[in-house]
Amino acid sequence: MTSEIILQAIVTGLMMGLIYALIAAGLSLIFGLMEIVNFAHGEHLMLSMFSSFWLWSLFGLDPIFSIPITILLMAFCGIITHYFLIRYILKAKMLIQICATFGLSIFIRSIAQLLWTPDFRNVDKPLLEGRLEIGSVFIGQPQLVASLVCLVAFIGLYLFVTKTETGLALQATAQDRHAAEILGIPSNKMFAIGWAIGLGCVGIAGGMMANYFFIFTDVGINFALFAFVAVALGGFGSIIGCLYAGVIIGLVESLGGLLIDPSFKLLYVFAIYLLVVIYRPQGLFGRY
């Protein structure tokens, strides 16, 4: 095995890791804010990919140009999810919250299968296609642009949460919602904003991946699983931890499949998850 092949795997892992990081950041933001795990995160990613596909199929809008629309659609979906479901289970037991979001995932997937069937779809001849050759490394243009857009979005999210007034209000609500309400911060509004931003993240990731991934009703399952691992690895509620965790997962998946056995790629990732849960349950970075 040559060093060029290993370098190719590293580059591929880094690009996928940045996408995993943004997906996980949306999940982590929601959990850190409300301590509710969104088990429908993968289905929301699937909806974002289908949104890009149908905007291309019906209106000829290339996925890279439909990203703003996809973000708005998914943010609206997050607000609807909060006001019509989540706010009613905020004070419920954890088991009820898990069943509610898990049931939401089944509902969304079932509706998608009814409307669109489980067939595989793809965007034919997108604006981004082809590959770049840098030395001995080949980089697909759609993958490169998707990873860079996700990185920029991640940085924007982190700066928003840590530097803006609304972001600081989100952090205050996450730390102590009752104290935040005493200070005049409307927790219900913050929760809705958190859901909008969290699903906006999957809107960006899903919209970019629609350029080169097959789109089908179960497409979000593996991405959601990796997002859960990234959140656990980086620290529940830690946004910056998702970046490092996403990159680690991408590299483990890529290098593990190359150096050991590609059929066990998922095993390597979940082995890391188990080790983290057992030996460092708070994750590498803790909250925020």
Question: How would you name each of these model-derived features?
Answer:
Residues 5, 115, 119, 175-189, ...:
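Cytosolic-side transmembrane-helix boundaries in multi-pass membrane proteins
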Residues 11, 33-80, 84:
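Membrane-embedded helix boundary and interhelical linker motif in transport proteins
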Residues 1-22, 51, 62-66, 92-99, ...:
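Membrane-interfacial amphipathic/re-entrant helices at transmembrane-helix boundaries
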Residues 60-104, 111, 244-249, 280-281:
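Alpha-helical transmembrane segments within multi-pass membrane transporters and channels
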Residues 27-49, 63, 91-96, 166-169, ...:
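Short, non-helical or kinked segments that cap or interrupt transmembrane helices
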Residues 16-17, 138-216, 239-244:
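Helix-loop-helix "hairpin" substructures at the membrane interface of multi-pass membrane proteins
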Residues 20-22, 60-72, 195-273:
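Transmembrane alpha-helical segments in multi-pass inner-membrane proteins
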Residues 59, 88-163, 190-193, 255, ...:
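Transmembrane helix-bundle core of multi-pass membrane transporters
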